[in-house]
Amino acid sequence: MIKISIDAMGGDFGPEVVIPGAAKAFERHPDIRFIFFGLPAQVEPVLARYPKLKEASEFRASEVAIGMDDKPSQALRAGRGKSSMWQAIEAVKTGDADACVSAGNTGALMAMSKFCLRMMSDVERPAIAGIWPTLRGESIVLDIGATIGADARQLVDYAVMGAGMARALFEVRKPTVGLLNVGTEEVKGLDEIKEAGQILCDTPLDGLEYSGFVEGNDIGKGTVDVVVTEGFTGNIALKTAEGTARQMAELLRQAMSRTLLAKIGHVFAKGAFDRLREKMDPNKVNGGVFLGLSGIVIKSHGGANAEGFCSAVEVGYDMVRNRLLEKIEADLAHFHHSHSHVSSKA
């Protein structure tokens, strides 16, 4: 049995999306048990619509719901100990839950997670890792917005953690890892990127295969299993990809409705277009993982629908089932030991 705590008030639609999404996840994974946190007047009526889910879940009342526009410092002051977001995270800390899922305010969720759960040993900064659809299937990209800027050591930690996540989700024994850069040549890029690349070259690991620098157009190609960057660049890349996907979908819709012949062609190609739409649907790959914390926290997109929230829950489920935290902690310890040994010999 896997226990997942849910911030039922998170996201643009709160319980109206969160609870149906959890119900979908429960249908697919009957061994999940949920603990919902939220305002009783809003959560209980929605939960009552799903009797099977309600029977297999627990509801705990909260006093405060964190707003999507609240500043992290404001959210910490107002919500510590009594908000649905804080209580869902705290359930992981106390062992009541194995993972937490929230569609709430990203900054507040990260601040509360760091304050409540603390960081893994030897990890200086957390990263948000996202699943990215590619021509080869899916890749992991991190950091997509946890922090602005990262030094060489932090980028290397992201590489090790991202590779651990890839092994857990994709069942790849030795994921390929690339550092996002302005070119693939070794002389290009910022000093911290070049230094991180040198560290990864000098410290071979069983758990990942370093493939060098990759460019922005390599992300969608699926050139590597894990793309590593700092949060400022990663978030811009994410938002650009989301905007491009929406633009392409709209341009395609316009082209297919422009003439009678185009409309007829659309009818015959409907199956192919439906498969393309499903491939590009952000709800299918929803769920950013906060890596580097001493507990599992999953961030769902605030505007996700029920299917999207279900996807985020499933990411958390897979993380727990595959013992992600233990594996990442072991990988980091092994890497830091190996790197210190290589450095001392140098």
UniProtKB/Swiss-Prot annotation:
InterPro entries in UniProt: FA_synthesis, Phospholipid_synth_PlsX-like
GO CC field: cytoplasm
UniProt catalytic activity: a fatty acyl-[ACP] + phosphate = an acyl phosphate + holo-[ACP]
UniProt keyword annotation of Thylakoid present: no
Gene3D superfamilies the UniProt entry points to: Isopropylmalate Dehydrogenase
GO biological-process terms attached to the record: fatty acid biosynthetic process; phospholipid biosynthetic process
Subcellular location: Cytoplasm
EC number: 2.3.1.274
Pathway: Lipid metabolism; phospholipid metabolism
The keyword Lyase is annotated on this UniProt entry: no
Similarity comment: Belongs to the PlsX family.
Alphabetized PANTHER family for the sequence: FATTY ACID/PHOSPHOLIPID SYNTHESIS PROTEIN PLSX, PHOSPHATE ACYLTRANSFERASE
Quaternary structure and interacting proteins, as annotated: Homodimer. Probably interacts with PlsY.
Cited function: Catalyzes the reversible formation of acyl-phosphate (acyl-PO(4)) from acyl-[acyl-carrier-protein] (acyl-ACP). This enzyme utilizes acyl-ACP as fatty acyl donor, but not acyl-CoA.
Name the record gives this protein: Phosphate acyltransferase
Organism in which the protein naturally occurs: Brucella ovis (strain ATCC 25840 / 63/290 / NCTC 10512)
Lineage of the organism: Bacteria, Pseudomonadati, Pseudomonadota, Alphaproteobacteria, Hyphomicrobiales
Gene (UniProt): plsX
